Amino acid sequence: MTSVAGPHKRLEGKVAIITGGASGIGACTAELFHENGAKVVIADIQDDLGQALATKLGGKACYIHCDVSKEDEVINLVDTTVAKYGRLDIMFNNAGIIEGQGLPVSVVESEKSDLDRLLSVNLGGAFLGAKHATRVMVQQRKGCILFTSSVCTSIAGLSGHAYAASKSGVCGLAKNLTPELGKYGIRVNCISPYGLVTGVSNVSGEGEANREFVEAMLSELGTLSGQTLRADGIAKAALFLASDEAYYVSGINMVVDGGYSVVNPRLVDSINSKL
């Protein structure tokens, strides 16, 4: 009898760290990477969720507590991963926080403390993750560093100023790392999602009804009719960028927004009203 080959595992044999991996985009990506053959290290401060996910995924996954704003914890994360698995192929700097409810706030009502907090986690955490992953990947002469940014890097007025500043900084960091790390065979890319409901999105409130309401609102505001962006859409983008299929893709900001950022809705509405 001829055996039938199983589905192609796009990350077979690779080792991946996913920060913010206990919930939302991170958890969805951890599951997808695991399904595709990767050994997955889930890094987060949500210990119960992170450990539960690692247990669910089984032997090729583990959980490590890590506050990405603290360099000693990021060093421990990377060093423990390499000690356990012998290498590091993919560093997905996904951990992030929002300000307030994630909605636009007047600059005069914004607090410096919020800016400091968001820069420390969103941008500082991305910087530290890239820095210490690079230590390992340079020796391997190969690797992939990914960042989660936001569609607010492409279109203004969608978020608070501190959040927009932190996520724009992430895109700038990724772009600036690209030529330096390219010399060592390391690819660097950003993923910038349109609005979606995740564990970090306080706008969803509590309960499935609120989640469905916000998803419906985001879908209606979006440009791509009949589709709703969920965490799996970002996980699939990360899978492509982390896989060998993207072997020559580096330095991009992959905006996953259904075309939202290329449209001027006010202009479109004005034209349509006159037709």
UniProtKB/Swiss-Prot annotation:
Record-annotated active site: Y163
Name of the protein this chain belongs to: Tropinone reductase-like 2
Keywords (A to Z) from UniProt: Oxidoreductase
The protein's role, per its UniProt record: Has no tropinone reductase activity.
Sites where the protein binds NAD(+): 17-41
InterPro entries in UniProt: NAD(P)-bd_dom_sf, SDR_fam
Top-rank taxon, per record: Eukaryota
Residues binding substrate: S150
SUPFAM superfamilies (UniProt xref): NAD(P)-binding Rossmann-fold domains
Gene Ontology MF, one: oxidoreductase activity
EC number: 1.1.1.-
Family as reported in the entry's similarity comment: Belongs to the short-chain dehydrogenases/reductases (SDR) family.
